[in-house]
């Protein structure tokens, strides 16, 4: 329990909730960890079934059916009986996504989802997260330092600097922001400096067309 203050979730103070209320609320939240956090001793199918068996009273057959559906949704076939060590890092991440959506959550929290992945796989994971977010009407919150992800799929963007909310906006506004700390972080590389100039030009064209 915190020493002071409140933690508000959907208008409710969770610090005053009972253990059973917290468990019920937990079913509304999916978690995608930085390192996938799969159980080495469980098969791919077993990993996705875990939250269903832990947090629901569904039958084994029902849990298995839901887990198989989630694995198909993340485009994984023929790996259900394999163990995490027998599949690639990108496939492990997709297993973790399948597990995160198994309980059909309202919210999906992702911690550095592209960590350790090659650029091509990172794009595939970004697209998968974006598709699932819109398909199932989930609010997805992604903590990332990967500006490719921010620019690629970010819709409502919050820039946290030294523990404080420094800036809030969308992808278009990133390229026209005068916030010095944001610019130093986003456009630290030569590539993004060049992209910034191009995007500002495109943004201005778009603004002119709307007038």
Residue ranges of model-derived segments:
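Conserved ABC transporter NBD signature motif
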Residues: 5-13
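Conserved ABC ATPase signature
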Residues: 83-87, 91
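A short, proline-enriched helix->beta-strand linker immediately N-terminal to the Walker B motif
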Residues: 102-106
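Catalytic Walker B motif of ABC-type/P-loop ATPase nucleotide-binding domains
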Residues: 108-111
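Helix N-cap at the start of a conserved alpha-helix in ABC-type nucleotide-binding domains
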Residues: 119-121
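C-terminal boundary and immediately downstream tail of ABC-type ATPase nucleotide-binding domains
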Residues: 172-211
């Amino acid at each position: 329990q915190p020493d002071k203050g409140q933690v508000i979730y959907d208008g409710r103070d969770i610090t005053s909730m009972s253990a059973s209320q917290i468990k019920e609320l937990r079913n509304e939240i999916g978690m995608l960890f930085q390192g996938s956090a799969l159980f080495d001793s469980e098969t791919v199918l077993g990993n996705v079934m875990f939250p269903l068996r832990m947090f629901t009273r569904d039958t084994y057959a029902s849990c298995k059916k839901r887990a198989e559906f989630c694995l198909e949704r993340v485009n994984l076939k023929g790996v259900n009986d394999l163990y995490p060590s027998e599949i690639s890092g990108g496939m492990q991440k997709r297993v973790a996504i399948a597990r995160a959506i198994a309980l059909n959550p309202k919210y999906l929290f992702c911690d550095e989802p592209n960590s350790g992945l090659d650029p091509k796989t990172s794009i595939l994971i970004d697209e998968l997260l974006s598709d699932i977010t819109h398909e199932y009407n989930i609010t997805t919150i992604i903590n990332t330092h990967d500006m490719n992800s921010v620019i690629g799929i970010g819709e409502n963007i919050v820039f946290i600097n030294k523990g404080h909310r420094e800036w809030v906006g969308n992808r278009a506004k990133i390229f026209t922001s005068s916030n010095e700390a944001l610019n130093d972080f986003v456009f630290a590389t030569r590539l993004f400096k060049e992209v910034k100039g191009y995007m500002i030009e495109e943004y201005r064209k778009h603004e002119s067309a709307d007038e």
